[in-house]
Each structure stands twice: as C-alpha cells, then as structure tokens.
C-alpha cells in the first residue's frame, strides 16, 4: 500500500489538542512552501501536457499509463492537495474532469482497495474541504455537490464485491460481469482499509448500506477467529477467508499487506469516538503488543528501533518504507489518548525510519531493509555497522510514509529537527527524481544518483508526498486548522 495517508474527515484530529508549534521566519516559511508548490505544479503541468486524462504520467518517455482503470487517478488524488495549496485553477480543472468520469466503464480488473483509497477517498476529502474551510475556491456549488454524487456512483459500482458468504469482499473484481478473480482469501490491509471511506460515504449520503458493508467485513478483524489468528493481543494475521471470515494464518506485520488496517483503527476512533471506541481499544492493544513483542534494535545500532514481523514463534528482522507510517500512527494515537508512552515510542520509530533516509547516498530511504546481523550481505557489512540496517530493495517509487511520520512528529512536538527532515527529504526527491515533466522513481537509493529511473509517476506523489511537505512548511502551519488538515489527507495515496 502507499498510504494512506490519513483519511477523510478522516482523521479529524481536534484543534483543541493544542499541539505545540514553532514558527519559522516568514521568509523561510514562504520560500520552502513556495518550493513545494512549484514542484507540485511542475508535476501537474507535465501530467496535463502528456498524460491527462489518463491515470499517471510516464515522466521519462513523456507518455501515460492507465494502471488504475483509466479514470484519471492522478487528477483525483491531487484534488485535496490542490485545495490545501489554494490553487483554484487546478481545483476547478480536476472538478471538471471528475464530472465526466463514468465509473461503470473500464476494460480492466478493478481493485476494490486501490479504487477506494485513491478515487473514493480523493473525492470525499475534496468534498469535505470544499464544503468547509475551502468553500471559496469554487464559485459553483453544484460542482462540489457533484463530488458526492460521483462518490455514490462509485460506491454503487463497487458494492457487489461484498456479496460473499462472509461479507469479506473480493478485492479484484470485474465491474461489468460482477465477477472476481476467484480468490479464496483477502488481505488484512485490503479488507481493513475500506471502512473509513465507506462509512463517510454513508454519513454524507444518509444511505447506511456502504457503512454496513464495510463494517461487516471489519467485524471479523476486530474479533479474530480462530485464536491462532491473533498471536498477541490486537496483532492479527495477514489473510482472511472470504468464505468464513476466519484468519488463515498468524503472520503479524506492520508492513505492506497489513499496514493500513492498524492505521485505520485509530483514524476511525478519531473520526467518531462514540461509535468507534472498539476500534480504539483494538489499536491500543496492537500498539502495546508491538512494543512488547515486535520492537527490535539492530546489534550495530542499539539506539535505533524498528518493528519486526512475527510468524510461528520467530521474529523477522526486516521492514519496509510502507511500514514507516507506524511512527505517525503512534503519535496520532498517543496524542489523541494523552499517552506519553505511545508518543515516546512513536518518536523512536520516526528516528529509526529517519536513518533509512539519512544513511543512503541519495538521502532517500529504500523500499525494504533488514537488520539481522546473521544475514548482512557481504558488500554491505561496513554499511550495516554504520547505518544499523542493510538494503534489501533499494527502489524508491515516490512513497510518502517517512515524510508522513516526520510531519506528525513536527506537529506533535514542534521541534525544528522534524521540519528540517521533511525539507531535506523533499530537496533530495526534487534533486534525484525530478525530470523535465515530473518525477520518476529510483532503482537504487544507495547508488550514485539513485541508479536508474522508473518511468512512472505514482498518483500518491500528489496526494501525499507533496501534501505533507507543504503542510509542514505552509505559513502559519496553513490557514486550515489541524482538524481540517486531516480532512485533506483522505487519500492514502
């Protein structure tokens, strides 16, 4: 997964939390924010010139891709960031495009998960912002109302995926034939990263069907069966039977495939504490169990902390860029619950993931890394001794999770170091990934110049990387309160 992101009204963190802030000199704030806006506009202009209305820009060949069903994923994913940046021109361009999308038509298989987090999340967050703090950006209110109608249209197209014996949905579906790929299981993250957007859709439309469908699927994750599917309190396996709703393994991880299930537990509680107190309880159990059973420090760098995986009595000493949202999740949960211990542990996780950026040649973190001293590649022994990890996959595909957690750390602590880390990451992405028309991924972050480049610009560059970088440096921490900032972060990206 990419992330999340936060999610719609999503992680409605109340501004009454009174998070501490530090203030940059206005000139520095303005120049950093302006640089991020320029990078966003650069990527957007390239997308519009060479790829619109397709899903993504191919920023080296100056062509386009349609990996997300050809509905214009980059445009929809960019909406909330364009709103936060108060770019009315781009906002209205995107609204005009969304009004023309026919979500009932595609020649490709549809991913329920990806379509929910990019399209449904993108439209709902845009709707909330344009009905609230950014209402002045769009003069024609019917264009904003269209976002909710299109969200409902999309939900109606997708909802047959939940028509299974258990209510656990199929992920890969054919919206024309109402068929599926014949899978017997669905993943933890895929099943557990629908409930926020689908619940929000019900709350906005008054039609409870969407919430009921997603919450029924979630119910199996909140009360896992059999007991082997929950090796530690709150920590559950990675695969669920579509037929029965039971867990089919006990593989525990905060990595891709499981990650955003844990992320959404706390965000559901923040969204509505009265309705979703159980989600909070499950997140707390998972967070505490992770501290007790998954926290791991490299032998060469005992000052660092990562979350290991667990399976059948053994820890796996490896992690992913995707998992680096974990520090931000602890910081959000710890702040909302007034738990200093969870905040402190979250900052340890942030520091660990920060090193995956600080130690590479590009200053950008790898797709996956390990710290098992018995498995260090021969050509990385010196690097491991210094850095505390070794690179497993050196790719960088414009993922946001590390910057996301830096952003949380800055908002929670007010410490300049975290804002600087966001800025340094942004500068390095701008340096090594930028092309003439946009931003490309890197094949090896620990090679000179990042190795070669991937000819693809993921939509979550717009939805998350640029948004977190901008919000960290926006003058006055942006004119939108922290509650509304989190509305903006609907799309996980």
UniProtKB/Swiss-Prot annotation:
| Predominant localisation class | cytoplasm
Question: What reaction does this enzyme carry out catalytically?
Answer: N(4)-(alpha-D-Man-(1->2)-alpha-D-Man-(1->2)-alpha-D-Man-(1->3)-[alpha-D-Man-(1->2)-alpha-D-Man-(1->3)-[alpha-D-Man-(1->2)-alpha-D-Man-(1->6)]-alpha-D-Man-(1->6)]-beta-D-Man-(1->4)-beta-D-GlcNAc-(1->4)-beta-D-GlcNAc)-L-asparaginyl-[protein] (N-glucan mannose isomer 9A1,2,3B1,2,3) + 4 H2O = N(4)-(alpha-D-Man-(1->3)-[alpha-D-Man-(1->3)-[alpha-D-Man-(1->6)]-alpha-D-Man-(1->6)]-beta-D-Man-(1->4)-beta-D-GlcNAc-(1->4)-beta-D-GlcNAc)-L-asparaginyl-[protein] (N-glucan mannose isomer 5A1,2) + 4 beta-D-mannose; N(4)-(alpha-D-Man-(1->2)-alpha-D-Man-(1->2)-alpha-D-Man-(1->3)-[alpha-D-Man-(1->3)-[alpha-D-Man-(1->2)-alpha-D-Man-(1->6)]-alpha-D-Man-(1->6)]-beta-D-Man-(1->4)-beta-D-GlcNAc-(1->4)-beta-D-GlcNAc)-L-asparaginyl-[protein] (N-glucan mannose isomer 8A1,2,3B1,3) + 3 H2O = N(4)-(alpha-D-Man-(1->3)-[alpha-D-Man-(1->3)-[alpha-D-Man-(1->6)]-alpha-D-Man-(1->6)]-beta-D-Man-(1->4)-beta-D-GlcNAc-(1->4)-beta-D-GlcNAc)-L-asparaginyl-[protein] (N-glucan mannose isomer 5A1,2) + 3 beta-D-mannose
Which keywords does UniProt give here?
Carbohydrate metabolism, Cytoplasmic vesicle, Disulfide bond, Glycoprotein, Glycosidase, Hydrolase, Signal
Indicate the enzyme's highest-level EC class.
hydrolase
**Coiled coil location:** none
Write out the catalytic residues in the record: 367
Keyword Transmembrane (UniProt): no
Disulphides: 324-353
The UniProt record lists the EC number as: 3.2.1.113
Q: Which cofactor does it need?
A: Ca(2+); Mg(2+)
MF GO annotations: calcium ion binding; mannosyl-oligosaccharide 1,2-alpha-mannosidase activity
Q: Which residues are glycosylated?
A: 87, 174, 489
One of the protein's GO biological processes: protein glycosylation
The entry's free-text remark on the cofactor is: Ca(2+). Can also use Mg(2+), but with lower efficiency.
Superkingdom, according to UniProt?
A: Eukaryota
In what pathway does it function? Answer: Protein modification; protein glycosylation
Instruction: Identify the stretch annotated as signal peptide in this record.
Output: 1-18
| Entry keyword Lyase | no
Of the GO CC terms on this record, one is: endoplasmic reticulum
* Family assignment from sequence similarity: Belongs to the glycosyl hydrolase 47 family.
Question: Any idea what job this protein has?
Answer: Involved in the maturation of Asn-linked oligosaccharides. Progressively trims alpha-1,2-linked mannose residues from Man(9)GlcNAc(2) to produce Man(5)GlcNAc(2).
Assembly description: Monomer.
Protein's name in the database: Probable mannosyl-oligosaccharide alpha-1,2-mannosidase 1B
């Amino acid at each position: 997964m990419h992330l999340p992101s936060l999610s719609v009204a999503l992680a409605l963190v109340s501004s009454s939390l009174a998070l501490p802030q530090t203030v940059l000199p206005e000139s520095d704030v303005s120049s950093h924010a302006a640089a991020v806006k320029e990078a966003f506009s650069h990527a957007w202009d390239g997308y519009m010139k060479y790829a619109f209305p397709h899903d993504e820009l191919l920023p080296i060949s100056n062509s386009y891709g349609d990996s997300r069903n050809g509905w214009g994923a980059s445009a929809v994913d960019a909406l909330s960031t364009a709103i936060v940046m108060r770019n009315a021109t781009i906002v209205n361009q995107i609204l005009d495009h969304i009004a023309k999308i026919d979500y009932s038509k595609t020649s490709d298989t549809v991913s329920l998960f990806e379509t929910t987090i990019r399209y449904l999340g993108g439209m709902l967050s845009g709707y909330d912002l344009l009905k609230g703090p950014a209402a002045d950006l769009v003069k024609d209110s019917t264009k904003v109302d269209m976002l909710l109608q299109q969200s409902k249209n999309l939900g109606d197209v997708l909802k047959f995926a939940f028509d299974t014996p258990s209510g656990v949905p199929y992920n890969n579906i054919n919206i024309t034939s109402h068929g599926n790929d014949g899978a017997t299981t669905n993943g933890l993250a895929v099943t557990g990263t629908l409930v926020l957007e689908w619940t929000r859709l019900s709350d906005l439309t008054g039609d409870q069907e969407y919430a009921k469908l997603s919450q029924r699927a979630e119910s199996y994750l909140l009360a896992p069966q059999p007991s082997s599917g929950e090796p530690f309190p709150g920590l559950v396996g990675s695969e669920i039977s579509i037929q029965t709703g039971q867990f089919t393994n006990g593989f525990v991880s905060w990595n891709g495939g499981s990650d955003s299930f844990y992320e959404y537990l706390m965000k559901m509680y923040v969204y509505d504490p009265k309705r979703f107190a159980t989600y909070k309880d499950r997140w707390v159990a998972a967070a505490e169990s992770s501290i007790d059973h998954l926290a791991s420090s490299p032998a060469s760098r005992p000052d660092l902390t990562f979350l290991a995986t667990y399976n059948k009595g053994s820890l796996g000493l490896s992690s992913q860029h995707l998992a680096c949202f974990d520090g931000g999740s602890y910081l959000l949960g710890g702040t909302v619950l007034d738990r200093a211990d969870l905040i402190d542990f979250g900052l340890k996780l942030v520091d660990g993931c920060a090193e995956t950026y600080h130690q590479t040649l590009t200053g950008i973190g790898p797709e996956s890394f390990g710290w098992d001293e018995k498995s260090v590649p021969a050509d990385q022994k010196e690097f491991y001794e210094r850095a505390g990890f070794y690179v497993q996959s050196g790719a960088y595909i414009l993922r946001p999770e590390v910057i996301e957690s830096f952003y949380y750390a800055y908002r929670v602590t007010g410490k300049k170091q975290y804002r600087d880390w966001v800025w340094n990451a942004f500068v390095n992405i701008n340096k090594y990934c930028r092309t003439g028309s946009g931003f490309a991924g890197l094949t090896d972050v620990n090679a000179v110049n990042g190795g070669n480049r991937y000819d693809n610009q993921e939509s979550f560059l717009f939805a998350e990387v640029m948004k977190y970088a901008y919000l960290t440096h926006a003058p006055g921490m942006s004119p939108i309160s922290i509650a509304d900032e989190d509305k903006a972060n609907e799309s996980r990206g």
